[in-house]
């Protein structure tokens, strides 16, 4: 097997005992599997839940707290306990654990986005195991990832991972709830995540976690959009991750083995950059962007809204008001209003670096699957 870069996400239910406390035997099982993959030469990035689950007991809570303040306090205590456990276990196999606590704002700035990539890449080059969790102690609702499933998908995307492995206590996706319906059929492989699957998926199945099968499907959908294949399932023993990559995992495989991956810059434009305005384009420009791989020119712009500057990211909508994509503009809003509908040679004097395009193809991301019908 060629060297692969794999993001592994471990949920709270796969780390805790029946009372909700941190289970060191379960943690050791995961560490053994990751260490084995490292010994085989693979790059492994771990996204771990469990900070709140590890911390609420020592704080005196009988069960997982439900208030934001309670969860953040438990995370403050539990994160250090969780990392102590991981560091001690990985040290037994000769590997160093590295902690990274992230918030959603770390992805908004392109500079911080690039720095995060450089940091994780350097850790991998030096043989360390990056262990990532959301910084639950300081995150506010507007700046959260939602859960670690989505965080793992975003990390897998910008690291250009070969696969995202979502380890859970259920061995894959079913057409019904296997806990209540013994006739439920498991999907061994799915080419994509459909809206029907999302609608039928339930919420969290655990009292110690925030995610459920729906959140895993949303994460899988996001990872697939980046060009990352996904596995959702379970396993035990040191070879479980190797088995998963070899196609022998106990779960569901989603997506093609080696899809085309989205460039890191385009990931930032599509999913992380703040959107500063909206540009409306005519049908000709829509077809050029979606069907012919062209840049957006001033002649195709019919309306401009928002107070954006050159090099900001904006949404692009068609004449029906449907978002077709997102891109980084070479014109400030005030200047684009002056030149919309005009030829590029007349308009370029108002653009950043006198570029003829409003949005160059390299700074464009299509967000709509449908193509223009001819």
Swiss-Prot record:
It catalyses: L-glutamate + ATP = L-glutamyl 5-phosphate + ADP. It holds the Pfam family PUA. GO terms for biological process: L-proline biosynthetic process. Residues 276-354 form the PUA domain. Pathway: Amino-acid biosynthesis; L-proline biosynthesis; L-glutamate 5-semialdehyde from L-glutamate: step 1/2. One of its GO terms (cellular component) is cytosol. ATP binds at residues 9, 168-169, 210-216. InterPro entries: AceGlu_kinase-like_sf (IPR036393), Asp/Glu/Uridylate_kinase (IPR001048), G5K_ProB (IPR041739), Glu/AcGlu_kinase (IPR001057), Glu_5kinase (IPR011529), Glu_5kinase/COase_Synthase (IPR005715), Glutamate_5-kinase_CS (IPR019797), PUA (IPR002478). It is found in: Cytoplasm. One of its GO terms (molecular function) is RNA binding. Substrate binds at residues 49, 136, 148. Keywords: Amino-acid biosynthesis, ATP-binding, Cytoplasm, Kinase, Nucleotide-binding, Proline biosynthesis, Transferase. Its EC number is 2.7.2.11. Catalyzes the transfer of a phosphate group to glutamate to form L-glutamate 5-phosphate. Belongs to the glutamate 5-kinase family. This is Glutamate 5-kinase. It comes from Geobacillus thermodenitrificans (strain NG80-2). The gene is proB.
